[in-house]
Amino acid sequence: MKQVDLLYTGKAKSVYRTDDPEVYIMKFRDDITAFDGEKKDTLEGKGRYNAEVSTFIFRYLEEHGIRTHYLASIESGVIAVRNLTMIPLEVIVRNVAAGSIVRNYPFREGEPLDPPLIVIDYKSDAHHDPMLNDELIYALGLATPEELDQIKAMALAINELLSDYLDLRGITLVDFKMEFGRYNGEIVVGDEISMDSMRLWDKETGTSLDKDVYRFGKGDVMETYAGVAKRILSPPWGEPA
């Protein structure tokens, strides 16, 4: 497999075509942004940590019967992925009220959400990622009712798997964002699941363990990302390595 040309550059990743039309190369860059790109920096090693965590989570999901676009790790910060037809939806599962849902609705910061809330936004920079309901999704032709039902079921299954996994490592999965695509008639998890797309709190202290550290200047971003990666990639506390 040989890298051919650049297909897409996002805020923190670049995607390349290869000589195999079914396979893309995804490179996690060291760029970090917040507030729709108004705040941006480059932090050496950040891309590697996100790639390691995403790779681990994708493999974990595959082991539990959830299809993802992940194929293989190529080198540090670089993975091979399936060529999906992406669905322009950002699917957010919220277990605890935090962030925009507290700013926009009468929830209290830290309020448990049981059952978890699924919020779906239209992935569109031009329209500033507005929230969608099912009817808007159908009217815009973004997904069929059957596809949306499957996406929601997968999102809740992933949430349960990751919440339990992280809980054993002393981390609360507050909320997280996923993207999905179509591959050979199947709905498949795409993009990434990392500290950039999850909101994580330390169970004991409530300390932020995600990109909020960068957004709001809460501490050393790289120290935080390195620590979270170590906890996610290690056995649960009390178990031998």
From Swiss-Prot:
Catalytic activity: 5-amino-1-(5-phospho-D-ribosyl)imidazole-4-carboxylate + L-aspartate + ATP = (2S)-2-[5-amino-1-(5-phospho-beta-D-ribosyl)imidazole-4-carboxamido]succinate + ADP + phosphate + 2 H(+)
Gene: purC
Keyword Acetylation: no
PROSITE patterns recorded: SAICAR_SYNTHETASE_1
Originating organism: Methanoculleus marisnigri (strain ATCC 35101 / DSM 1498 / JR1)
Gene Ontology molecular function, alphabetical: ATP binding; phosphoribosylaminoimidazolesuccinocarboxamide synthase activity
Pathway info: Purine metabolism; IMP biosynthesis via de novo pathway; 5-amino-1-(5-phospho-D-ribosyl)imidazole-4-carboxamide from 5-amino-1-(5-phospho-D-ribosyl)imidazole-4-carboxylate: step 1/2
One of the GO BP terms on file: cobalamin biosynthetic process
Stated name of the protein: Phosphoribosylaminoimidazole-succinocarboxamide synthase
